[in-house]
Regions:
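Phosphate/pyrophosphate-binding loops at sites that engage ATP/ADP/AMP, CoA/4′-phosphopantetheine
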Residues: 84-99, 205-206, 255-272, 291, ...
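Short acidic, glycine/serine/threonine-rich loops at helix termini
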Residues: 16, 113-117, 144-147, 172-178, ...
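Short beta-strand segments
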Residues: 6-8, 105, 135, 160-167, ...
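Condensing-enzyme catalytic core mediating Claisen C-C bond formation in acyl metabolism
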Residues: 1-75, 175-251, 255, 338, ...
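Acidic-glycine-rich active-site phosphate/pyrophosphate-binding loop
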Residues: 111-125, 164-175, 225-230, 284-298
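Conserved beta-ketoacyl condensing-enzyme motif
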Residues: 46-125, 268-284
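Flexible, glycine-rich active-site loops centered on histidine and acidic residues
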Residues: 156-162, 166-188
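Claisen-condensing/thiolase-fold acyl-transfer catalytic domains that form or cleave C-C bonds
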Residues: 108, 126-128, 133-154, 250, ...
């Protein structure tokens, strides 16, 4: 089975307290958003303590056009992706020349040539590397990319697959959008960059713990296209997400996980480690109520959200990094995220501490 060789995340220069962001958002929205005082509690309800941003707060007080915002996305995405990759390569104790495949995940900016090409060129990675850029999966992208990386390594036991997830959510902030969705988004989303390396069976994996991939599942829920996504405007990306998301999760997630695990003669009670994309407090509550697992089974997920906010696709890799570096129970692990489509992504793992 393919194995996780290393996972790494980065911190940005601007780690800002949620209360400071709250007061800054109040100042920005107050002149044109009558409900601002009533809605400020959204910042507290998230239970987020701090968030990472690629820019100082003052940057977001000025209107930036799409051309400027996207140019900054390309520049900073490349810079921070390379930092995460270099940390991951060092942790995996491999040479960059050994990487055979690269999967690049993002939904918060555009680039052609794609960012993976820019990374390969800047780092002088193998010029024959297999490239898979993926755009548009949003919060589900991290799990989808992780599954695809493992599937590549399963198909080619000599593969050393690099997965990179870069989300600069703050650069999509529209200064003159005084909608409820934009206000709620400003209370929740943050910037995150993470990378992991998956090695095939024929390669020697030097990881301190064993996390192996068993299988994955994707599901798209019919007639839910408008639940989450972007509206593309002349000014940039306008965030769209429905208040029905927790209800959709609550209605579907138990049956989806149960059906997935049954294929491998497993039940939810057999899972020892839950590596979930947090989404937000209401999403976590929906998971807890639907799955009815004893104990604080989403502890790592909750702590990542509290410390970082929702970093879209990269968030679940932050959770994976925390589990990988700290502690977990020997046994099965389950990685889950939901995203635009509306869709779910799942991966089943076998986990053992060395």
């Amino acid at each position: 089975m393919p194995q996780l060789a290393a996972v790494a995340k980065i911190d940005f220069p601007y780690r800002i307290d949620q209360q400071e962001v709250k007061q800054y958002a109040k100042k920005l929205f107050e002149p044109s958003f009558p409900q601002v005082e009533k809605m400020l509690c959204a910042f507290d309800n998230t239970e987020i303590k701090t968030r990472n941003f690629c820019k100082p707060l003052e940057y977001y007080s000025t209107v930036h056009g799409f051309q400027e915002q996207n140019a900054e996305y390309i520049r900073l995405a490349l810079e921070y992706a390379i930092k995460a990759i270099e940390a991951c390569i060092a942790s995996a104790k491999i040479r960059k020349e050994e990487i055979t495949d690269i999967i690049f995940i993002s939904t918060t900016g555009l680039s052609t040539p794609s960012l993976d090409a820019l990374i390969i060129n800047k780092m002088r990675l193998n010029e024959n590397i297999n490239r898979i850029p993926v755009f548009g999966l949003g919060c589900a992208g991290g799990v989808s990319g992780f599954s695809k990386a493992n599937i590549l390594a399963k198909a080619n036991p000599d593969a050393m697959v690099l997965l990179v997830a870069v989300e600069l959510c703050s650069l999509t902030f529209l200064r003159n959008d005084f909608s409820k969705s934009n206000f709620i988004g400003s209370s929740l989303f943050a910037d995150g960059v993470a990378a992991c390396i998956i090695c095939g069976d024929n390669l020697s994996c030097k990881a301190k713990n064993s996390i192996k991939f068993i299988a994955s599942q994707s599901k798209l829920y019919y007639d839910t296209l408008d639940v989450m996504g972007w509206e593309f405007l002349d000014t940039g990306f306008k965030v769209l997400f429905s208040q029905d998301i927790p209800a959709i999760i609550g209605k579907n997630i138990n049956a989806d996980i149960t059906n997935f695990l049954e294929k491998y003669q497993l039940k939810i009670s057999d899972i020892k480690n839950f590596i979930f994309h947090p989404g937000g407090k209401k999403v976590l509550t929906a998971y807890e109520e639907a799955l009815q697992v004893k104990g604080d089974f989403l502890k790592n997920t909750r702590e990542v959200m509290n410390d970082n906010g929702n970093m879209s696709s990269s968030t679940v890799l932050y959770v994976l990094e925390r589990v990988f570096q700290q502690d977990f129970e020997d046994g099965y692990g389950l990685v889950v995220a939901m995203g635009p489509g509306f869709s779910s992504e799942m991966a089943l793992l076998q986990m053992h501490k060395h």
